[in-house]
Amino acid sequence: MKKIAVLTSGGDAPGMNAAIRSVIRMAVFLHCKIVGIHRGYSGLLEEDFRPLTNRDAGGIVLRGGTMLKTARCPAFFDEDNQKKGAQILRNHGIEGLIVIGGDGSVQGAAALSSLGIPTVTIPCTIDNDMHGTDETVGHDTAVNAVVGAVGRIRDTASAHDRAAIIEVMGRFAGNIALDAGIACGAEYILVPEVPFSREKLARSLIGQMKEGRTNSIIICAEGADDGRALGDWLKERTNIDICTTILGFIQRGGRPSARDSILGSLLGAAAVKALLDGQITSLIGMNKGEIRILPYSEAAKEKKIFKKGLYTLAGILGAAQEDEDIAESGL
């Protein structure tokens, strides 16, 4: 291959720029022209392209967001638009495409591959919910952002003898809530993978207050419950002063952690090598510290396995062990 392209798609995640930088530098090192596509698949359909050089990679590794911009593009699920995108790439002489993003981005890349465009994907999402890699680019930074925020919230909750609900991202996967909850010592962690009982949670909070615990941290993934609604319900049910914080996009932005910068750099370089070596139609992930190249067909077979052992540990370390388990049923 003499000319390849790179795009970022879907939700942004810290470390995307590290991956882009690595893709550019490795492509240039291997004497391959590299083209950037702005705003993901939307930019592909609109032919919003620009040539990239080593100079474009300068100073971006520690920046959040993505220098190529990103967008969600529901239109790209349409087969006619997929064919249009493939033809546009051919018209520009682009022989391969590196996609940086999450599950939806993989679907778009797989569609282009089925139309004869060689593609590889770098898993990049704060949710860490992609099968085929132990960790996705952006997850570590998001977890650190939550841990930092919870530390500040606990200080003020403690000063006022309050319980605090912190709602974090994770509609279908509770990895941010689980990892951050373990790291910051949350008393309760609510995730979509494990339905919980509001009533049991209320009884546990009341029991904790009677035992002298004047504040508790409840980390709630958005897919487990609505944080504000839960807070209002618990206030009425328990008469405990409860504050609710929705962290929102603070989890996506900011300088990537060293871990995410390194991971993005490793996967970016590996993606270029895989594409040029013909290891196409693949997800480039990390498994037990080693680069893993997984065909899309295998990556799409199953969802990432929920960390049941870590969730059980969270219950032991948190308040739930002292009262009844708040889960509706055991794992």
Per-range role (PLM):
Residues M1-L45:
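N-terminal phosphate-binding or glycine-rich loops at protein starts, especially the Walker A/P-loop
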